[in-house]
UniProtKB/Swiss-Prot annotation:
Catalytic activity: GTP + H2O = 7,8-dihydroneopterin 3'-triphosphate + formate + H(+)
Signal sequence coordinates: none
GO biological process, one term: tetrahydrofolate biosynthetic process
Protein name listed in UniProt: GTP cyclohydrolase FolE2
Annotated GO MF terms: GTP cyclohydrolase I activity
Source species of the chain: Pseudoalteromonas translucida (strain TAC 125)
Biochemical pathway: Cofactor biosynthesis; 7,8-dihydroneopterin triphosphate biosynthesis; 7,8-dihydroneopterin triphosphate from GTP: step 1/1
Pfam families the record matches: GCHY-1
Regions annotated as coiled coil: none
Length: 302
């Protein structure tokens, strides 16, 4: 059968940085430290470069079939990704010397409630990118962690209104503890509440080229532990009350959240990182953002 990619001349010559496919539907079994291998449904991208200037194109079917083998016959881990990248290059000998595989998927994790004995599922968006260039493999991991952020300014303003209401109600009275507690338990007592919003920490890290396993769960857990207010799964009343307490004791502007995560990542063994904090404001019609990078030469840029 005719092979146009090999035999037909290019209409115009020139090298290309990446050629391949995107939005490939691909279920696969994902391996990560801390969980049993789990089947996820991903959208994949697969690319090689084209450094032969007069080549008509690449062999996309070879990339597709290599991913299909990864999906149906293997589990996704650093070793199998390295094998797939090597095949991308070897199957394009003379055409390509760089390759990329990217998976976007949601990782389901069981999450315990704060105080009750309940648990539920939470899904975490993950992007796993692997590349090879000049024989060197690089892995990059991106996760989104959703949490609640309560505005420190709004909390201060709410406290002031509560103080004013208290002074107005009891300005001329000697107050017993019982009366104070009863009043604080009414809507008249708590006349204002601070605003909070669902927020997302998007964190991207570069992994060591020699890793033998991915550890997505540890990255997610350490971020949630640092922020203190991750969005919950199963919730009973005691859990909701504890969540309210945690929000009140961990007030955060986007700058605060970014500095927390930056300080956390500095203690880890990642060669580089990039983070963006997104506070989807409930007061404003716009979002509040903060971005930070490790700052290594030639690394991620803000």
């Amino acid at each position: 059968m005719p092979d146009i990619a090999n035999t037909a001349p290019a209409l115009q010559t020139g090298t290309l940085d990446w050629v391949g496919m995107g939005e490939i539907e691909l279920p696969f079994i994902f391996e990560s430290h801390g969980i049993t291998p789990v089947t996820v449904n991903a959208k994949a991208r697969a690319f090689v470069n084209l450094h032969k200037e007069d080549a008509k194109g690449i062999h996309m079917s070879r990339l597709f079939l290599a991913l299909d083998t990864l999906s149906t016959e293997q589990q996704v881990n650093p070793q199998t990704l390295a094998q797939a990248l090597d095949f991308f290059i070897s199957s394009h000998e003379g055409l390509s010397d760089k390759a990329l595989i990217e998976f976007k998927f949601e990782l389901p994790l069981r999450r315990k409630s704060l105080l009750s004995d309940k648990a539920g599922w939470k899904s975490y968006p993950v992007i796993l990118t692997s590349t090879i260039e000049q024989g060197v493999i690089n892995y990059e991991l991106s996760v989104d962690v959703t949490y609640s952020s309560t505005c420190p300014c709004s909390a201060a303003l709410a406290r002031q209104l509560i103080q004013n209401a208290f002074a107005e109600k009891f300005s001329q009275e000697t107050l017993s503890q019982k009366e104070a507690l009863e009043w604080l338990g009414t809507t008249q007592g708590i006349v204002a509440t601070p605003h909070s919003q669902r927020s997302i920490a998007n964190v991207k890290v570069k992994l060591d080229s020699n890793i033998t396993q991915f550890d997505v769960v540890n990255l997610i857990n350490t971020i949630e532990d640092e922020l203190k207010t991750p969005v919950q799964a199963a919730v009973k009343r005691e859990d909701e009350q504890e969540f309210a307490r945690l929000n009140g004791q961990n007030l955060m502007f986007c700058e605060d959240a970014a500095r927390k995560i930056k300080a956390l990542l500095e203690t880890q063994q990642y060669s580089d990182y990039w983070l963006q904090i997104n506070h989807y404001e409930s007061l404003h019609a716009h979002d509040a953002l903060a971005i930070a990078v490790k700052g290594v030469a030639g690394g991620y840029r803000a």
